[in-house]
């Protein structure tokens, strides 16, 4: 069997109904769209949230909150991710070079998820209390 010889099983594919081809087809005249109305017209698509002209829910409710710009340039990384690195010195440049964080990230915090078995040096990164204890227990240090 080759890819160019494969075909669907008999009866697996249904031919599509041809619309507007006489009343004998079952889909003639109005082509299954009913009579008149907004949805019977061509080019019709009622957008999500449309409530028939009444002010929709997303406009009746007040706005709240905002998106912090800081969230786009900060991230957290797990302690387990650091154990994948070969370098003993961990800083922002090292993490970007190893593709652990995107290039646009400016601030990183190391959190305690997973464990680390070798001594590493963390330079100019924020570290949670638990991660700090784990790094120091493995013989590493935080600068």
UniProtKB/Swiss-Prot annotation:
Reading the lineage from the top rank, the first entry is: Bacteria
Q: Which GO terms describe its cellular component?
A: cytosolic large ribosomal subunit
Pfam families (UniProt xref): Ribosomal_L27A
GO BP field = translation
Kindly state which keywords UniProt assigns to this record, in alphabetical order: Ribonucleoprotein, Ribosomal protein, RNA-binding, rRNA-binding
Entry keyword rRNA-binding: yes
Q: Where is the composition biased (Gly residues)?
A: 21-31
Give the Basic residues compositional bias ranges. Answer: 11-20
Q: Which GO terms describe its molecular function?
A: rRNA binding; structural constituent of ribosome
- Read off the PROSITE patterns from this record: RIBOSOMAL_L15
Keyword presence, Flavoprotein: no
Q: Which InterPro entries match?
A: Ribosomal_uL15, Ribosomal_uL15/eL18, Ribosomal_uL15/eL18_sf, Ribosomal_uL15_bac-type, Ribosomal_uL15_CS
Xref: SUPFAM superfamilies = Ribosomal proteins L15p and L18e (SSF52080)
Quote the function comment for this protein: Binds to the 23S rRNA.
How does the record describe its quaternary structure?
A: Part of the 50S ribosomal subunit.
Protein name per its UniProtKB record: Large ribosomal subunit protein uL15
Q: Say which species the protein is native to.
A: Baumannia cicadellinicola subsp. Homalodisca coagulata
**What is the organism lineage in this UniProt record?**
Bacteria, Pseudomonadati, Pseudomonadota, Gammaproteobacteria, Candidatus Palibaumannia
